Amino acid sequence: MTSASANLAHNLAATAQAQPHARAVILDDLVLTYDEVEHSARQLAGWMRAQGVGEGDRVALMLPNVPAFPVLYYAALRLGAVVVPMNPLFKRREIQFYLEDSGASLLAAMPGEDAAAAAGATGTRLLTVGPEGLSSYVHGDDAVDPVEEVVPRDGDDTAVILYTSGTTGRPKGAELTCDNLQSNQLATTETLLHLDSSDVVMGCLPLFHVFGMTCGMNTAFATGAALTMIPRFDPAKALEVIERDRVTVFEGVPTMYGAMLAAAGAAATPPDLSTLRTAISGGASLPLEVMKRFEETFGATILEGYGLSETSPVASFNHPDAERKAGSIGTPIRGVQMRLVGPDGAEVGASSEDDPQVGEICIRGENIMKGYWNRPDATAEAIDGDGWFHSGDLARRDEDGYYVIVDRKKDMIIRGGLNVYPREIEELLYEHPAVAEAAVVGVPHPELGEEVAAYVVLAPDAQADEAELVRHVKEQVAPYKYPRTVTVIDELPKGATGKILKRELRGDGA
């Protein structure tokens, strides 16, 4: 059914009408109200329309977390265009691939030679977002007639093309529909975060990533909560902003939680985070030791969940009104089904201590992408004939229906024919007081196929040698599981969202 309300731009319009003077976006001393963001989005939509952008056209946004991002995001959606978020750290080759693959007609980016060169090479119009933001397009010489009405969209129309990280080849664009994103933000808002207009959401997750886009920006703008931004995550800055803006909801990936703990420990004065009521973690498994220390230090409850770009992203969560099981990713959210399947495709049952059952997570529901942009074969491989999306993640399910991630299918180590799940070993390393971060990977071995190797970052002023860390794990697991090497490094390689890039540790580029 085609309607204006299916279009995500309706959320901003409705909130601006209901509470025009409420804070929408905060970036240090800059505060924009919902009326100001809505006015700017109408003006920018008019400018885009004057450049020939229309319904179904792709608009690429290559911006950090700055107020221009939500303005341009909702402006493009208002026209019925499709948003293509991009990492602002991309170089020319990466930018050019995204523009060519998506067929974007417009690229919005910060000033830079790479963006200009890629736009020129692909014939893509470039909108440069300078230090003054978008003022010239809203109030100045470039301003044109605004788009007053939200273009009606069908629920199955593509709203966003979100490219996967490309860990197994070139990135693929997941087509997320209006219904995908609306249902996911509604379920997140109403059943997980319980957001309302009194809340302040911390926007330090990149808005070009589905976690920050849906759980941060879309939920805030649909409920009238304020979104306070950090252009690039810095743990000390995050603590400062939580205290200054009285943040109530923090959303992060596991490495952010560890970094904030370290920053709090190094601060001359303990930060006042008393307003923080809920923190949510996703993107990777949160070490239990980090969860415990964060909650003890800051007094906020962490709810761990699970999702992917292809699932808009939230698929399951530890629901706040149900039992929380630390270390689990909870149960499926409203409108979503999950199950586990084995290598033969048969469904895997519940696990018990005597009978552990591991299978690949498969997901079906309102959150599943339409498909991969212009890649029907990849779509057919990922989504089976019954509508189940195959995630590539391994998990077990307990008798209460709670799922526990075991590992990425591709990250599982097969040592001499025996399966080793890196997360189990990482959890043990995190229990050592000297370890701040840990990652375990499989490395080639001429006889065993793969050997277990660990990389760790030590906590500030901590000391531990390889033998001590190997012994710490060896004493607690079967002989085939413990790492034969533990390498201490200054920093683990991470992606834009803070997720640890194990492929770089393996050195295989996979």
Predicted feature locations:
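AMP-binding/adenylate-forming catalytic core of the ANL superfamily
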Residues: F90, L107, F250, G365, ...
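Gly/Ser/Thr-rich phosphate-binding loop
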Residues: R244-G252, L261-R324, Q337
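Conserved ATP/PPi-binding loop(s) of AMP-dependent carboxylate-activating enzymes
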Residues: T331-G335, A346-A382, V420
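ANL superfamily adenylate-forming
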Residues: L106, D114-G155, R170-P171, A263-A266
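Conserved pre-ATP/AMP-binding loop-to-beta segment of ANL
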Residues: S5, H21, V144-Y163, R170, ...
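Conserved AMP-binding/adenylate-forming core of the ANL superfamily
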Residues: T2-L8, A13, H21-V66, P70-Y74, ...
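Conserved AMP-binding/adenylation subdomain of ANL enzymes
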Residues: Q182-V200, F208-V249, A263-A264
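Conserved AMP-binding A3 loop
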Residues: T33-E36, A159-S183
